[in-house]
């Protein structure tokens, strides 16, 4: 065994000990949900015509979490669910991208963690060429927006490998370059100008939602319209329709973003069923946030556990082409993973950004009916108008979802 093989084996052993892949053994009879789609908990039988001589061909894929020959059956997960999970766009930290200028004043430096400040001074004198250590909420927000756009462009049943050119064009909008309309550069620029968030500072759900709203509007018809609640999980129909309706009066595809806080240090148990129901709605495009000081993108649930995509992996930035060059198959693969991760709801941070994609009038009516009939305590309320709600008041409002603090 050569040194490369030894290094790979060591990496796999360390990962197995400190960050083992979850097994379907805690709630083996509970249905698995992924953004509104339900999967039977028991895996389908799959076979792999793999001989010992061919095993080495899959080592790189196994480490990247992209191989079809993996531990899906051994860990008890149905292949249909894992394929759906793998097809979701996974935005992560990136390195070696064009610098994001930093502000050289005490006010700008104060919000940064000590580690990021030292790294910036030593390695990035012209600005940030990586978002490692501070960009996870932006990446989670990009993931939410990208998957909403993916659903609009290619459909909810799309799976990785199909219509690669269309996917590549979508991903190019999020390239780590100042000219890409939905890049981290654009998020940071708008955050500094309009949200009081300096380059290198961790974004909260509220600032992320406002960036998504503004940047999507600048994209025209490429991105959906965006309705952002005022740091609450209350949705006002009159306000939503002003955003969603076109000149003809029909509802256009609209992304609903609700920034909320479901507790103080952890998600209050009374909201557990309501939060799980969020990812079971067919309009769901996921949840960004939800992990103390480390944002993730949550897309699935089984029992009390939530499945998520973790942005805390640093990969080289994908080159941005102004002449329309499409991403290669290898470059596209860096936006996907079969590596399942999950967390118990009691360990989630209560501050989060919840997203829904409403496509048309029927979808809007369906969504309203579903959020009003969830099991357990509701976390989302829909009202006709903000003024009427203010004048009438609402019994028990102080006992419900807390306003979001994005400080």
UniProtKB/Swiss-Prot annotation:
InterPro entries with a match to the protein in the record: Papain-like_cys_pep_sf (IPR038765), Peptidase_C54 (IPR005078), Peptidase_C54_cat (IPR046792)
Pfam families from the UniProt entry: Peptidase_C54
EC number of the protein: 3.4.22.-
Gene Ontology CC: nucleus; phagophore assembly site
Reaction(s) this enzyme catalyzes, per UniProt: [protein]-C-terminal L-amino acid-glycyl-phosphatidylethanolamide + H2O = [protein]-C-terminal L-amino acid-glycine + a 1,2-diacyl-sn-glycero-3-phosphoethanolamine
Disulfide bonds: none
Keyword terms of this UniProt record: Autophagy, Cytoplasm, Hydrolase, Nucleus, Protease, Protein transport, Thiol protease, Transport
UniProt similarity note: Belongs to the peptidase C54 family.
Function, as annotated: Cysteine protease that is required for autophagy. Plays a key role in cytoplasm to vacuole transport (Cvt) and autophagy by mediating both proteolytic activation and delipidation of atg8. The protease activity is required for proteolytic activation of atg8 by the cleavage of the C-terminal amino acid of atg8 to reveal a C-terminal glycine. Azg8 ubiquitin-like activity requires the exposure of the glycine at the C-terminus for its conjugation to phosphatidylethanolamine (PE) and its insertion to membranes, which is necessary for autophagy.
Protein name: Probable cysteine protease atg4
Annotated source species: Aspergillus oryzae (strain ATCC 42149 / RIB 40)
Taxonomy of the source species: Eukaryota, Fungi, Dikarya, Ascomycota, Pezizomycotina
